[in-house]
């Protein structure tokens, strides 16, 4: 509904001689006695108008020119809020747009002609995906879906961490297990990867090569085989919850020199050095962030010669700018919180518009089974695996539970709750609302000859009871919820919203007879049910969960 009010508020401001680029906030009051919507615009602009907020609010109310039959009353409340009361028929006429636009309801073309890249999952290919990585995967996938509703050309990218010390450890781990297959006694380091999958990869190599690799210290074949097997497994796991990527960027390419051309990492060092932001001491190469007011410089190349995470991350982002992306969204775990401000600062120093880079940090996940928390450790081989979770609770529950809490909050994944077939389970609750409507429509077609294909929503203005108006009002919030999700990079807002829609539909279903109502009201209530189903479907598509027609 923000789109409805905005032009009228802007027109009133223009008439009052007030020009502003401040964002006009339009909200729903918690208490309906304060209206259906309200704005704090008088607070925001009182200083520019040289009036107190109540005085400015009163002036603006006199300048609003809402069409007849839309806003029934405007009033000043408290120290200067402007409250709007809408006509019931206006809610219902507006709800017709849901049926008219169908799956396009909530979509805009604000991102048309712009390229966006969303990087997510990007787990090291050192073992099967853990549940913690799954949360970031679903978060990133939902953000990509949200961007597509706004017309962006979206690339979903996986940053393949195939360089660095962890890959050396992986190769060594497989080689140790391979030597055991060859009959040798090996002291396996505690610091190495100990899961059964390491032994399985080693077994494959032994079957293919017998013991011919045992006499060599060369790790290449062990690294390449482990990478291929593990990454194939990662992709299969992600596909089980509907996550696929369009592009895979290999970290090792940032280390490569091509025909005398410096590597991506080296180019970053050279460019920062040209800006006098590189220091060399203690045997390492440093990003001199003390010049930016920080307490310490940050290492880019360690004394061992290995780069820190910061250097390839900076170089990787340079490639995103070079590839022409207008918006770059990165989804990371909480372990990146300290590092990423340095990456953004480096991009600014190098002359890039760092405001195009958006960061979504998701907090850690623990799983509870039977009241017991499961610990995760890939290296120790007792990781809480995403595959096992999907097998246990299903793809829909896995996805929804990962995003039903704010990304900024620690998530406790209650496996038992995710498996419940009751309203306590948020997945069941949402999908049941959709299935209930599908069942109702089938029954209406059979018993009263309802023709879904002919439904236009034209009869909706006949409805004016409180449950009906509350339901229609909630449906019209859908476009604003999409915008809120994008602004905050927070699809959890969509989960909350759809729960509200389902809750209001269940109340409407209980309090407003449908098939037993008079014909005109029956048709209107069936059409209202269709609008609810459409909004649920559109929301489910963003969240990546199915819309069952029966349960």
Curated annotation (Swiss-Prot):
Localisation: Cytoplasm
Chain positions of motif 'HIGH' region: 123-133
SUPFAM superfamilies linked: Anticodon-binding domain of a subclass of class I aminoacyl-tRNA synthetases, Arginyl-tRNA synthetase (ArgRS), N-terminal 'additional' domain, Nucleotidylyl transferase
MF terms (GO), sorted A to Z: arginine-tRNA ligase activity; ATP binding
EC code(s) of this entry: 6.1.1.19
Enzyme class: ligase
Catalytic reaction list: tRNA(Arg) + L-arginine + ATP = L-arginyl-tRNA(Arg) + AMP + diphosphate
Family: Belongs to the class-I aminoacyl-tRNA synthetase family.
Subunit structure: Monomer.
Entry-linked NCBIfam families: argS
Protein name: Arginine--tRNA ligase
């Amino acid at each position: 509904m923000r789109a409805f009010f905005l032009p009228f508020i802007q027109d009133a401001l223009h008439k009052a001689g007030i020009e502003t680029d401040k964002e006009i906030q339009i909200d729903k009051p918690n208490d309906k006695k304060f209206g259906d919507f309200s704005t704090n615009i008088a607070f925001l602009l009182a200083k520019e108008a040289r009036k107190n907020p109540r005085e400015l609010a009163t002036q603006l109310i006199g300048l609003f020119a809402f069409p007849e039959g839309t806003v029934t009353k405007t009033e000043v409340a408290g120290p200067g809020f402007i409250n709007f009361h809408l006509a019931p028929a206006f809610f219902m006429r507006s709800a017709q747009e849901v049926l008219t636009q169908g799956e396009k309801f909530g979509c805009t073309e604000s991102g048309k002609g712009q390229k966006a890249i969303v990087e997510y999952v990007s787990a090291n290919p050192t073992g099967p995906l853990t549940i913690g990585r799954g949360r970031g995967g679903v978060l990133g996938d939902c953000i990509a879906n949200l961007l597509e509703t706004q017309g962006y050309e979206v690339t979903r990218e996986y940053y393949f961490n195939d360089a660095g010390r962890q890959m050396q450890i992986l190769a060594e781990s497989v080689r140790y297990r391979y030597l055991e297959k060859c009959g040798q006694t090996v002291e396996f380091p505690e610091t190495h990867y100990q899961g059964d999958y390491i032994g399985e990869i080693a077994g494959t190599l032994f079957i293919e090569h017998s013991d011919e690799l045992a006499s060599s210290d060369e790790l290449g074949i062990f690294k390449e085989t482990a990478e291929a097997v593990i990454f194939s497994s990662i992709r299969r796991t992600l596909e089980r919850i509907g996550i696929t990527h369009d592009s895979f960027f290999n970290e090792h390419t940032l280390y490569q020199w091509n025909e005398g051309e410096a590597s991506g990492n080296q180019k970053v060092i050279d460019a920062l050095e040209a800006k006098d932001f590189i220091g060399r001491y203690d045997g390492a190469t440093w990003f001199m962030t003390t010049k930016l007011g920080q307490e310490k410089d940050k290492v880019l190349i360690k004394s061992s010669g290995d780069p820190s995470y910061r250097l390839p991350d900076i170089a990787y982002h340079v490639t995103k700018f070079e590839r022409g992306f207008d918006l770059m969204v990165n989804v990371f775990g909480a372990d990146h919180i300290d590092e990423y401000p340095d990456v953004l600062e480096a991009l600014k120093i190098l002359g890039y518009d760092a405001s195009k880079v958006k960061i979504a940090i998701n907090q850690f996940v623990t799983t509870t089974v039977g009241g017991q928390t499961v610990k995760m450790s890939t290296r120790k081989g007792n990781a809480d695996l995403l595959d096992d979770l999907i097998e246990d609770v299903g793809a829909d529950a896995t996805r929804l539970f990962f995003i039903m809490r704010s990304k900024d909050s620690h998530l406790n994944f209650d496996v038992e709750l995710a498996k419940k077939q009751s309203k306590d389970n948020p997945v069941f609750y949402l999908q049941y609302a959709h299935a209930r409507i599908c069942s109702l429509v089938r029954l209406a077609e059979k018993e009263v000859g309802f023709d879904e294909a002919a439904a236009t929503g034209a009869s909706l203005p006949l409805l004016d009871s409180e449950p009906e108006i509350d339901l229609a009002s909630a449906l019209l919030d859908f476009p604003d919820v999409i915008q809120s999700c994008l602004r905050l990079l927070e699809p959890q807002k969509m989960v909350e919203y759809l729960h509200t829609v389902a809750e209001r539909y269940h109340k409407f279903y209980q309090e407003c007879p449908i098939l037993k109502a008079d014909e005109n009201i029956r048709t209107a209530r069936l059409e209202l049910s269709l609008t609810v189903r459409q909004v649920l479907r559109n929301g489910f598509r963003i969240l990546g969960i199915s819309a069952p027609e029966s349960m």
